[in-house]
UniProtKB/Swiss-Prot annotation:
Listed Pfam families: FtsK_SpoIIIE (PF01580), FtsK_SpoIIIE_N (PF12538)
Protein name, UniProt field: ESX secretion system protein YukB
InterPro entries: Firmicutes_EssC_C, Firmicutes_EssC_N, FtsK/SpoIIIE/SftA, FtsK_dom, P-loop_NTPase
CC terms in the record's Gene Ontology section: plasma membrane
Name of the encoding gene: yukB
Length: 1495
């Protein structure tokens, strides 16, 4: 063992280097994180560090970054820093440990000199030993150490005077460590051999150590503080002292004597003078003598007074000293330092956890040592100080009172039970003291009574990590440590703690109750919980709820006003109490010395202790299931043999536990024994669920599956049935883990159906009891097995409170079913107020495990015995009126099976402060057994094996599980046409669950109703996807009106979907109605021709089958509220379309959103959950099951009512996954039907249209003189203006309405159509100027340009006229074709202003005379520009009846058109093409400005 000894400033510390990794640096500095902490030296030059050399046991010594040298084993190394010497010694030898018996010795002398030494250590035997001597003294049962010479250390500090020893104190002398234990044993750890007169012995083991790790409290030694009353008497009054001096006594007679002498000289009188002189002389002498005599007597009296009172004070001093020492000893005993507690813990002292919640001091803490008030009383008896002087004796008396009024160097304590406590000071000091405070509470208070919750900064985790081993940090209600250091741990722990405390707060008479465990919250990070609701309890006075709070901060301003006790830490050695009981005080104290190194060992030791509570007796505390059968392996039970030999008709007795060491307790539910029905009660942690599992397993082991079976009622899905899920005896688990409103109805329907089934079998075989039927079955006369059915309900109290009718009917059914072999066991945590007369009268046996209080015990047993049970699994069995009343220990089926197992780990997990985090699973070899297998698992495996071996078939279960919430339609595919599974029906009264199909031609239109979010749209998608899987796009056309939230959007790309409509596509919907009406008329005509009335017959007879048309409207509420006209059309559509193969499916959030006339046309109605349930009654009346707020849960009304769960269109875990899967399935269908013709969509104009897009997308026909103007608004087909037929065209429109764009569109085509000549007159903004560069275009700017163009055109026309006349003469005029000569004008007014009358006349003549020769006149302008004027050109233009209108028809009078009411505005890009008084609304393409880019 390698130890480093550090000597400095009359102190010594040691560090075990063997426990440190070789690469770990050893540091000596002022910080607590250093390996050795020396807080009294600032280390301004840097900390001292030791680095191990690669070879040997040498260390290099550094001061800061400077290497000072090398330290070797058994060689001293001294260095200096901050003018302080520090001596380092490295020892490498292994120390020896010896124990010696001190006997009756009151003094043990330890010395390096052999004379009179009880322990002699020769300094020459150890290199670092020196001449020194000290004595161990025993007085009054306590030891002390008295140094006499040399250096002696106590707990690492040098001592110079006699010092009392406390438990765990360690004496260091010449590298020998000594410790007094057990009052008469001396432990010595030494490196050098020594001689001693003491007897060596072996340290005996205490009872606590022998029973370790089991720990049980012993009677606590409680010492009272001395409360004597010490009265001080006044000293006798000091005698009055005259102030007259000697001169004042002799002066009067002396003066008289002198006067008489003078008189005698002046006037002699003879004898008179002599007499007077004698008298005055005598007076003088006697006065002097009397003065000295009185003075001597006063001195003697005063000496006596002082001697007597000093003796009195000395006695009082002894009395007070004894009281003071006693008080200090009591305080030291009850409030030892944390270091002493660590020592006591290492010795497994019986003082561990000696306090309980009933102790008055259970939350008192030691802060350190200081001056405390005496517990005894000191006063002065009688007398009035006002009437006497304070003399020296009085002052001594008062001084003694002042000295003993306070006890110095005594433990200073605070009581956390008084209210929240605040700690302020430097963070490092406060944290260091928190270690001690938590350690004290952990030592004295058991984890049964006290739990910690520590809220700190995450970066400080390493500082507090040792505390996680303290059992008090394990939360009682969850598997987590009481460490809160980030948002995750805060959210995981504080919410549940808040609920727990709130439950306490809501308890009646909470002020009188004592809650367990008591929670101590230690908070160093207030910010983390600053907004949490638990602060309402932590910041207030709530100790009666079992919570206390310690808050640490750097200043008191950071604390709340609710602090009851405030402790300030001034520095590393001093502190004071500023507030106590909410009153300002100032109580200084010195901090206890504390070493953190042993903290983790302390906490781990406490963690290993198993604190036992209660009294043991002969009943075993634990019994495994296999022990009931005296078996070590499951094969030894003989299950198969028991099945073959057991007879349930005679007895149902099975073992459930032990009532003595070898006395087994049996429970027999035969009606002639303990049965048929009973009750079980046990609070949380009592072993109630384990008892039920043991009883179920015991029945399964004893009886054949055809003789005993179970139906478990696990209302909240607690997992009681989980271990038995595969055994043949379990017929089902009735659970309501989903919170179904139909739980009671479904469960009762299942149970009643089972009773009816049994009654039918009894009638069939003419028996009236289960025992008779069992005999017939065993004889082979009855074919159907009928086992005893055990109905076992766990947590029936909660079930009764939420489903009272169900429990009442269940008990009634069990009463009726007793002869049918039905047994009922009701289990609850809290029987108080739950067991009514009906339950009690039908329960013959009762099992009471540990219950919460006497009231619960009396409720089930009629006595309070069960309230006193403390052992898990312990309980009372009571049958009838105490016919049987036994205390027993139930067997534990969850015990590990075969403790001597082998194999590998099957699970690896990280143990965190908040629980277990699984990392991986490792498969074990086939021949290796799982070391985590329990007895119940082993027995269940054996039962399954025997079942397979015997070929036993599991009986059908009367209980069908609740419908799943997500069922994909792919589980029940629809392979037939006109037969589509769309939902899964639940019929518990028939014990049947099966898919239900929709037959299109029989079930007709579909109405789907339900509130938002419950699956209407998804149901519609299910239908459509089912249709698409079976029908081809040629057989089925789908129209989707998606007025909802877009759920059906992925189906818009189905190959079967003709079109997809949104709410704002009114024009598209209008076109659809036109199309569908035309289709209805067409189909009616075809049916009349075939003389048939239904599509089924038509498709059977006709060679060309008609496709089914399925119209789907999602969110019909919109139609009802905003599309009134469309609603009437849909009503007609639903009425007329069904027989024609046109079907209708709608969804709505309210039934009232659908008109009754339409509702009557919906043969199939599907109702999801409705917020107003009464709406559904108009469709299906009063159902036997209530609709639950579960998406997809529906009531289907066809020829009957069905309760069902709708299928999902795809298999997905959530809505996002479903959306993606739906798109994927649609893509697959697109690929599948890619080669087939898909239904034509409703033609709609594009949002924007260019001339390029018009020519490419719509495949324009190339016809001579036919100019494509745009797309027809209705048919979305190209509309042409035939210049060969109509010759001239007006372009009418207001400013900025697109006239120039129309001219561009016409120019583009005319230029490409090889027009012979185009005259182009532009508007003022020159919008057509870029056409001037075209070879066929003459850009006309001036009057002269126009005249020249007219001259050229006239020459052409004269030539053509001659040709035309010649062709007429020859009869070939119809075959004569001329290329077009076009005059286009953008802005007719500006054109009229440019030309004169002569040009007007010539152009008017062109229009009249040359139109047949290829002249076309295309002017553009405002309609008013064409209607004004009477010149020849204007007159001729007024005759034109062909135009392109870019305005409302009613706003112009140039071309007469029919009047249209409420004519809509013409939007930009739209216009009318008018030919001979008939208009077509068209979308006009936008022509690009640069023609070159388009070429």
């Amino acid at each position: 063992m390698s130890l480093l000894w550090v000597f400095y400033q009359n102190n010594v510390q040691k560090l075990n280097l063997s426990n440190l990794p070789s690469s770990h640096p050893v540091t000596i500095g002022p910080d607590v994180k250093d390996s050795v902490t020396i807080s009294t030296i600032p280390f301004n030059s840097g900390v001292i560090s030791l680095k191990r050399k690669e070879s040997g046991g040498q260390y290099e010594v550094f001061l800061g970054n400077d290497c000072l040298g090398t330290i070797e084993t058994d060689i001293s190394f001294t260095l200096q820093t901050d003018q302080q010497d520090i001596r380092l010694i490295l020892t490498g030898s292994e120390p020896e440990k010896s124990v010696y018996f001190t006997g009756n010795r009151d003094e043990i002398v330890c010395s390096s000199e052999k004379t009179n030494a009880d322990i002699y250590l020769n300094p020459q035997d150890f290199a670092f030993a020196e001449q020194s001597t000290f004595s161990l003294l025993r007085a009054g049962g306590s030891w002390s150490v008295r140094p006499e010479s040399g250096t002696i250390f106590l707990n690492g500090e040098k001592i110079n005077a006699n010092t009392p020893l406390k438990p765990g104190d360690e004496i260091f002398w010449n590298f020998t460590q000594m410790r007094v234990t057990e009052q008469d044993l001396l432990e010595i750890v030494h490196y050098a051999q020594f001689e001693t007169a003491l007897t060596e012995t072996v340290k005996p083991s205490t009872e606590m150590q022998k029973k370790y790790p089991q720990y049980r409290r012993t009677p606590r030694m409680v010492y009272d503080l001395p409360d004597d009353r010490v009265s001080f008497s006044f000293p006798s009054q000091e005698s009055d002292q005259t102030n007259r001096g000697l001169w004042l006594v002799i002066l009067p007679p002396l003066v008289m004597l002198i006067v008489m002498g003078v008189v005698a000289i002046i006037q002699p009188r003879g004898i008179f003078i002599l007499v007077s002189l004698a008298m005055f002389m005598m007076t003088l002498i006697t006065s002097t003598v009397q003065y000295f005599r009185d003075k001597n007597q006063r001195k003697k009296r005063e000496e006596k007074r002082e001697r007597v009172y000093k003796l009195y004070l000395d006695n009082k001093r002894k009395e007070l000293q004894a009281l003071a020492e006693k008080q200090k000893q009591v305080l030291e005993f009850h409030f030892p330092s944390f270091e002493q507690m660590k020592y006591l813990t290492s010795e497994i002292s019986d003082r561990i956890w000696e306090k309980s919640l009933e102790s008055k001091d259970y939350l008192q803490l030691r802060l350190g040592t200081g001056t405390v008030p005496s517990s005894y009383e000191i006063n002065m008896s009688g007398g009035d100080l006002a009437n006497r002087d304070i003399d020296d004796l009085m002052e001594k008396s008062q001084h003694m009172q002042r000295v003993y009024k306070d006890i110095r160097n005594a433990p200073v304590t605070v009581d956390l039970a008084e209210g929240p406590m605040g700690l302020v000071g430097k963070s490092q000091i406060v944290k260091n003291e928190i270690h001690q405070l938590i350690g004290q509470l952990s030592f004295f208070n058991s984890y049964h009574d006290l739990r910690f919750v520590f809220i700190f900064h995450e970066e400080e985790y390493k500082d507090w990590e040792w505390m996680k081993w303290l059992p008090q940090f394990q939360m009682p209600h969850i598997y987590a440590k009481g460490f809160i250091y980030n948002e995750q741990t805060r959210d995981q722990l504080l919410s549940s703690l808040y609920e727990l405390i709130r439950e306490r707060d809501l308890e009646d008479d909470k002020e009188k109750l004592q809650f367990k465990p008591h929670f101590v919250f230690v908070i160093t990070n207030q910010q983390l919980i600053s907004e949490h609701v638990i602060l309402e309890y932590l910041e207030g006075q709530h100790e009666h709820l079992g919570i206390s709070t310690i808050v640490a901060a750097e200043t008191k301003e950071s604390l709340s006003e609710n602090i009851t006790t405030l402790v300030r830490y001034i520095n590393e050695h001093e502190g004071d109490i500023l507030i106590q009981k909410k009153k300002a005080v100032r109580i200084p104290f010195r901090l206890d010395h504390h070493q953190r190194e042993d903290n983790e060992r302390f906490s781990r030791t406490l963690r290993t202790l198993n604190h036992q509570v209660g009294i043991t007796n002969s009943i075993p505390e634990t019994v495994s299931f296999l022990e009931l059968f005296h078996a070590k392996e499951v094969k030894e039970i003989g299950i198969q043999q028991r099945w073959l030999t057991s007879e349930s008709s005679k007895s149902l007795s099975v073992p459930i536990g032990y009532k003595g060491k070898d006395d087994i307790v049996y429970l027999n539910l035969h009606e002639k024994a303990h049965g048929p029905h009973g009750l079980l009660a046990g609070t949380t942690g009592s072993g109630k669920s384990e008892f039920l599992q043991t009883y179920i397993l015991s029945l399964a082991v004893h009886f054949h599956p055809h003789e005993a079976a179970f139906l478990l009622i696990d209302y909240k899905g607690g997992g009681m049935a989980q271990p038995f899920r595969n055994i043949p005896h379990l017929l089902g688990t009735i659970t309501n883990i989903e919170g179904s409103k139909n739980f009671s109805m479904r469960a009762l329907a299942s149970i009643k159906s089972e009773l009816k089934k049994r009654q039918r079998l009894f009638d069939q075989y003419q028996v009236n009891h289960i025992n008779d039927y069992t005999k017939l079955y065993k004889q082979g006369k009855a074919e159907v097995a009928m086992p005893h059915l055990f109905l076992i309900s766990d947590e029936f109290a909660e079930l009764k409170s939420e489903e009272p009718d169900f429990i009442r009917e269940l008990v009634s059914a069990a009463r009726i079913g007793r002869s049918l072999g039905v047994h009922l066991i009701l289990a609850t945590q809290k029987p108080g107020g739950i067991i009514d007369d009906q339950i009690w009268s039908n329960s013959r046996f009762k099992v009471a495990l540990k219950v919460q209080d006497a009231t619960d015990s009396k409720e089930i047993l009629k006595n309070s015995d069960a309230a006193n049970i403390t052992v898990t699994g312990r309980g009372y069995l009571q049958v009838g009126n105490n016919e049987v009343y036994e205390l027993f220990q139930s067997a534990w089926s969850g015990a590990p099976y075969l403790e001597e197992v082998y194999g590998t780990e099957d699970e690896i997990a990280i143990v965190t402060d908040t629980g277990l985090i699984p990392l991986s699973e490792v498969d074990t070899e086939d021949n290796a057994k799982k070391d985590v297998q329990t007895e119940i698992e082993a027995v269940v495996d054996e039962i399954e094996r025997i079942q397979d071996e015997m070929g036993i078939e599991k009986l059908p279960s009367p209980w069908l599980p609740p419908l799943a919430e997500r069922i994909p339609r792919t589980l029940f595919p629809s392979n037939e046409k006109d037969h589509f599974h769309f939902a899964y029906v639940d019929e518990p009264d028939l014990q049947r669950q099966a898919p239900i199909a929709y037959k299109m031609m029989e079930d007709g239109n579909i109405g789907i109703f339900g509130s938002s979010g419950y699956g209407k749209s998804i149901a519609a998608a299910t239908f459509l996807m089912s249709f698409a899987d079976v029908y081809t796009p040629e057989e089925l056309h789908v129209y989707i009106f998606d007025f909802g939230n877009g759920t059906l959007l992925p189906l818009a790309k189905l190959p079967h979907t003709a079109d997809y409509f949104l709410m704002d596509q009114s024009r598209k919907i209008e076109k659809f109605m036109i199309r569908i009406k035309e289709e209805i008329d067409r189909r009616k005509r075809l049916f009349r021709e075939k003389e048939i009335s239904h599509i089924k017959m038509y498709n059977a007879l006709s060679e060309e089958e008609l496709p089914f048309i399925f119209i789907t409207i999602d969110n019909f509420d919109i139609v009802k509220d905003e599309m009134h006209e469309l609603e009437s059309e849909f009503v007609q559509l639903s009425r007329d379309g069904q027989s024609l193969g046109i079907y209708f499916m709608l969804t709505a959030t309210r039934v009232n959103a659908v008109r009754q006339s339409l509702l009557n046309n919906l043969k199939t109605k599907i109702v999801h959950y409705l917020m107003d349930q009464s709406e559904g009654y108009s469709i299906y009346g009063r159902p036997k099951f209530n609709l639950e707020p579960i998406p997809g849960r529906v009531i289907i009304q066809k020829e009957e009512l069905y309760f069902a769960q709708m299928f999902l269109p795809v298999d997905a875990d959530d809505d996002i996954g479903m959306f993606n899967e739906l798109k994927s399935d649609v893509q697959k269908l697109q690929g599948r039907f890619a080669s087939m013709e898909q239904p034509a969509p409703i033609p709609m104009l594009p949002e924007s249209l260019s001339t390029r897009e018009l020519s490419i997308r719509f495949k324009l026909e190339r016809k001579p003189l036919s100019v494509p103007i745009g797309l027809h608004e209705e048919t979305v087909s190209p509309v042409y203006f035939d210049l060969g037929k109509h010759k001239h065209c007006l372009i009418l429109g207001q400013t900025q309405r697109g006239k120039t764009n129309v001219l561009k569109v016409m120019l583009e085509h005319l230029i490409d159509d090889e027009t012979e000549m185009i005259g182009l007159f532009d508007s003022i903004d020159r919008g057509l100027s870029h056409y001037a560069k075209e070879s066929d275009v003459s850009y006309l700017e001036t009057k002269e340009d126009i005249e020249q163009w007219i001259e050229t055109a006239e020459d052409i026309f004269k030539t053509r006229e001659a040709m035309y006349v010649e062709a007429v003469r020859q009869g070939d005029a119809q075959n004569l074709r001329f290329s077009q000569v076009v005059l286009m004008i953008d802005g007719i007014t500006r054109f009229q202003q440019t030309i004169d009358t002569r040009i007007q006349d010539r152009l008017a003549n062109f229009m009249k005379s040359y139109a047949h020769l290829g002249f076309s006149f295309i002017p553009g302008g405002n309609h008013s520009e064409f209607s004004k004027g009477y010149d020849s050109l204007t007159t001729e233009m007024k005759q034109i009846r062909h135009a392109i209108l870019l305005m409302k028809k009613s706003e112009q009078n140039v071309i007469p058109l029919p009047y249209q009411r409420q004519e809509p505005e013409i939007q930009p890009g739209f216009g009318y093409v008018v030919e001979n008084g008939k208009e077509q609304k068209v979308q006009i393409p936008l022509c690009s400005a640069e023609r070159e880019s388009a070429r």
